[in-house]
Amino acid sequence: TQHANLVNNYYKPGPTTDLLRDRRCYRIARIGIYGQNYDNGEGFEPFKGIWGRFYIDGNYMFGNADVTADNWTDGVYAQQEDNDGNDYTWESEGKSVINNGSQVVDVKGVTTHTAEAAYEQVLKYVGACNYRDTYDKFIMDEVAERKATCNIQGSNHKLGYINHPSELVGIVEGVDENGYPVLVQVADNDLADTDGDGIPDYWETQYGLNKDYAADGNLKTVDENGEYTNLEMYLNSLVQDIMDKCREGGTVVE
């Protein structure tokens, strides 16, 4: 990343990080460059040797009041040093130019919370589905309580690392012998989809669509701005209440 805003993030190192006892325990970011020896295709050539500009502010480091109060000194500057990877230009150039002092990316329409508030919102609402299964709940509890229940010994295993669901058999409730959640199937007559376009009949009727016309799922008539398909609008409606709650208490960047 050449330019980025890193604002109001909540860092909570886990129990394994405690064992490191090094600067990774309080790292906000380790900023580097593509050095002249970096070889990953011609597309990277224009970016070699160029230090980016960053706006880093308001980030919270769990258990470290100094880094929370001052993100840069230990959280960023102390994380890097002159080395072959940055062409030994950190001290002579990088360290003095990466702190932009103000936003480097123009952001509009983004809801922002304080780091502490964002952390609470994530624990409540993060996820890729409109409900949480037994694993979602397990992970959220691990984060909230700062636990590392999984502790399988062996190569490539570390405290709290989960390499396969089977490692949690007997630890997480509601999973099968392979460690996968047992999902309950529920028949719902309201989810009839006559035309098979992925949108239930009840929703098509509610929003003036034709339940016998499959092609309208790909039209953009429901979105007043004409940007999202009707199918996308239906899918978003399944989690609209969650999205609304995510934004509560935040400030919209104009």
Predicted feature locations:
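Short, well-ordered loop/turn and helix-capping segments at boundaries between secondary-structure elements
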Residues: 11-16, 61-65, 145, 205, ...
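Short, well-ordered coil↔helix boundary/capping segments
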Residues: 46-53, 129, 133, 190-194, ...
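Intrinsically disordered or highly flexible coil/loop and linker segments, enriched in small
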Residues: 65, 148-153, 240-244, 248
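Glycine- and acidic/polar-rich repeat regions and solenoidal domains
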Residues: 1-104
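Extracellular calcium-associated, cysteine-rich motifs in secreted modular proteins
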Residues: 175-254
